[in-house]
A protein has these predicted regions:
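Phosphate-binding core of ATP-grasp and ATP-grasp-like enzymes
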Residues: 182-235, 240-274, 278-286, 298-311, ...
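ATP-binding N-terminal substructure of ATP-dependent carboxylate-amine bond-forming enzymes
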Residues: 2-119
Length: 385
């Protein structure tokens, strides 16, 4: 493994007379970057582990370790350098994390023995179903003869994100073709088509003793990728409570420290159907960086480091978050993008990626004010990313 340092020496760090643990993060993309920055603002140190030596979080990490998350020996060596480990994504095998934690006595949050309950789409659906939480009707596809002549979605159980690993099909002929193409990639599910009027997201965080919520937001998807997030989301108090009740049930059952995001469909009769979850900070939570006095990233790092959680308080009555998605393939012109977006009643976060490509997440913008929606749409339509 290769060790890269961003400081000449490491000193003991304290916050309110409490020594803070060194937190290790597996993964070095934008989520890792924002987690790192949040913990450093609290006075903590963060070591980051990733196989890409040029990953975005390298520029902010106190120590950056180049290694592979599918290599147990390299994971063990990294675990020995930190006090606690957390995750940027859910694509790391939970058994490897369990083995590395046992060999080093290093805590991992979320606890991999608990996060294994939801680490792929099949186990996640089974877990939610067993709790009595409404989910989209589905079945596992083991052979082409299992498929039915109805519209729906074929989904890979593991590794999907931003529409990748999800395939819309209108009939059995299409389903047969897609299944034969993807069946060698892993377990495949068929999910029935569901009519809904909104897609919503709720974030919750636990430190084992306390549970905090970020209220529902609406996510607006375009071609399988989140384009906008809006608060408030225009639902009733009853719908908000439905979400809290479901999330509380899940969080209590998981019984682990960390932050989780839950994505729901809202049906025409105002019932929530749980779509999926993520055991980490989430794209829909980037709005919390400017909407609340405590972001999802700060509360997540508080939860895994043993600090008191913060009850998030609103700083604005309303906000729209825009994902800045790549519009071309090539070098990313950061100064030009910042100039084109402007700075009136908004906050822009760029992710430090050197190259853009079509639909790649390059940053986000949080916009407030009465004209937030026209400005959000203008950014999408006119700014070259």
């Amino acid at each position: 493994m290769l060790y890269l340092f961003n400081s000449e020496f490491m000193s003991e760090v304290t916050s309110n007379n409490k020594t803070l643990p060194v937190v290790g993060i597996l993964g070095a993309g934008q989520l890792s970057t924002m987690m790192t920055e949040a913990y450093q603002q609290l006075g903590g140190r963060v070591f980051v582990f990733d196989e890409n030596p040029e990953a975005p979080a390298r520029r902010v990490a106190d120590e950056f370790v180049v290694g592979k998350t599918d290599n147990l020996d390299e994971l063990v060596a990294f675990f020995k350098r930190v006090d606690v480990v957390t995750l940027e994504n859910e694509f790391i095998d939970s058994q490897l994390l369990i083995d590395a934690a046992q060999k080093t006595s290093t805590n991992v949050f979320p606890d991999p023995s608990r996060y294994s309950l939801i680490e792929d789409k099949l186990s996640e659906n089974q877990f939610f179903d067993n709790l009595g939480i409404p989910i989209t009707e589905y079945f596992e596809v083991t052979q082409a003869s299992d498929l039915i002549d109805q519209p729906g979605y074929l989904k890979l159980a593991k590794g999907g994100y931003d529409g990748i690993g999800t395939y819309k099909v209108d009939n059995k002929a299409q389903a047969d073709e897609v299944f034969n193409t993807i069946k060698s990639s892993g377990v495949v599910l068929f999910e029935h088509n569901l009519e809904f009027k909104k897609e919503l997201s709720m974030i919750a965080v636990s430190n084992g003793d306390d549970l905090k919520f970020y209220p529902l937001v609406e996510t607006v998807q375009q071609q399988g990728t989140c384009r906008y997030v809006e608060y408030p989301c225009g639902v009733s108090a009853q719908v908000e409570q439905q979400a809290r009740d479901a999330v509380t049930l899940i969080m209590n059952k998981l019984n682990t420290c960390g932050l989780f995001a839950f994505e729901f469909f809202l049906t025409q009769d105002d019932q929530l159907v749980l779509n999926e979850s993520a055991p980490r900070p989430h794209n829909s939570g980037h709005i919390t960086l400017d909407l609340y006095d405590c972001s999802q990233f700060e509360n997540h790092m508080r939860s895994v480091s043993g600090l008191t959680l913060v009850e998030p308080k609103l700083l604005h009555d309303s906000m729209v978050m825009v994902n800045l998605l790549g519009t071309r393939d090539g070098e990313f012109d950061e100064p030009k993008v910042m100039a084109d977006i402007g700075d009136k009643n908004l906050s822009t976060t760029l992710y430090g990626k050197k190259f853009s490509r079509i639909k790649r997440k390059m940053g986000h913008v949080n916009i407030w004010g009465d004209d937030r929606w026209p400005r959000a749409k203008q950014i999408v339509e006119s700014v070259e990313i």
